[in-house]
């Protein structure tokens, strides 16, 4: 599984071309994962996640509210 990790505010975790920052963020939540900064979305994106990992979903988005 892969997807955007969610911060405490329910939003995607922002980044600006900093893959190492995103890798650390992803591994803090899911130890075996990897991550990078998705340039077009300016958000961290995690890969190699467990199937039950909670990631950002547009249908359940609670960001900003």
Curated annotation (Swiss-Prot):
Alphabetically ordered keywords of this record: Disulfide bond, Ion channel impairing toxin, Neurotoxin, Secreted, Toxin, Voltage-gated sodium channel impairing toxin
Listed Gene3D superfamilies: Knottin, scorpion toxin-like
One Gene Ontology CC term in the entry: extracellular region
CDD domains for the chain: neurotoxins_LC_scorpion
Disulfide bond positions: 11-63, 15-37, 22-44, 26-46
Single GO MF descriptor: toxin activity
Main localisation: secreted
Compartments, as annotated in UniProt: Secreted
Pfam families: Toxin_3 (PF00537)
Tissue: Expressed by the venom gland.
Domain LCN-type CS-alpha/beta: 1-64
Keyword Transmembrane helix set for record: no
Keyword Secreted set for record: yes
Domain characteristics, as noted in the entry: Has the structural arrangement of an alpha-helix connected to antiparallel beta-sheets by disulfide bonds (CS-alpha/beta).
Function: Beta toxins bind voltage-independently at site-4 of sodium channels (Nav) and shift the voltage of activation toward more negative potentials thereby affecting sodium channel activation and promoting spontaneous and repetitive firing.
Entry similarity comment: Belongs to the long (4 C-C) scorpion toxin superfamily. Sodium channel inhibitor family. Beta subfamily.
Record protein name field: Putative beta-neurotoxin RjAa12
Lineage: Eukaryota, Metazoa, Ecdysozoa, Arthropoda, Chelicerata
């Amino acid at each position: 599984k892969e997807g955007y990790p969610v911060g405490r505010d329910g939003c995607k975790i922002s980044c600006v071309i900093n893959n190492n920052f995103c890798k650390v963020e992803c591994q803090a939540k899911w130890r075996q994962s990897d991550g990078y900064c998705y340039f077009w979305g300016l958000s961290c994106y995690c890969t190699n996640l467990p199937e039950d990992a909670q990631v950002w979903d547009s249908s359940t988005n609670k960001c900003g509210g």
